[in-house]
Amino acid sequence: PSYSIGPDCYKEIPHVTRFFGKTAAVIGGKTAMAKAKKAMIDGVAGSDVKLLDFIEYGGDSTYENGDALIANPTVRDADMIFAVGGGRACDTGKYVADKLDKPLFTFPTVASNCASVTAISVIYNPDGSFREYYYPKLANHCFINSAVIADSPEQLLWAGIGDALSKEYEAVFSSKDDTLSHTPLMGKQISRICTDPLIEYGAEALESIREKKASFALDQVTLDIIISTGIVSNMMSTVDSYYYNSTLAHCVYYGSTVTEH
């Protein structure tokens, strides 16, 4: 995936998007957009890029919410889709952009998952239970604003560290009995580097987020959670050929969506 990281990375929006259009519909979570809005507006100030509107995505990555956005005239008229927020907001944005065949740019506001750079969307039913996977195209670029990440809830970074820690073990275990072709083999090998940065920098990254301060350690953990695991996901899953991206950790999570708790 193509990405930028840093406290001023939104200033790269005009340059990165220059070949894709001049107008963008921003869709995402209410809190996420509130935290990112000023930096996004400042990032495109003085450029040809116009942010048409900031539209709430509906709160969950369902086909119903995605289809409502697809029917929104502002979304339909925009040259580009900007998806802002956590995994479900990004997954919804991927579905919308794919169905409308528009360029997609993601703006993760939490480091809890790799959805902003993966070619898979987790789709839920309206009652919150897991429905299925949808396989969209990749986002054209991911903007990771480290100042916005530093202002996110500590428990979401903690969850992201746990999610990323499972990547190596799931990838290696689920593919252990198969002869892998080039792409999943590369994904398996990349999964082996997902663990060490979390162990080395995880505690310091959590301290940074408690203090609401960007840091080298927080950047390393953020990149591990979003980019490294995202690369593994893209290389180890396809629509119909193979799926080495999940074992017990994902099964427990998806099972929890259909139980009362």
What is each PLM-predicted segment?
Residues 7, 29-30, 84-86, 107-110, ...:
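Fold-independent oxyanion-binding glycine-rich loops
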Residues 58, 84-86, 244-246:
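Active-site nucleophile and cofactor-binding loops and adjacent substrate-binding regions
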Residues 1-80:
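ATP/NTP phosphate-donor binding region
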Residues 181-261:
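Active-site segments that bind and position negatively charged phosphate/pyrophosphate groups
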Residues 73-96, 100-110:
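A short, small-residue-rich loop immediately preceding and capping a beta-strand
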Residues 10, 33-37, 63, 88-95, ...:
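Short glycine/serine/threonine-rich phosphate/pyrophosphate-binding segments
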Residues 99-191:
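A glycine/threonine-rich phosphate-anchoring loop and its flanking beta-alpha core
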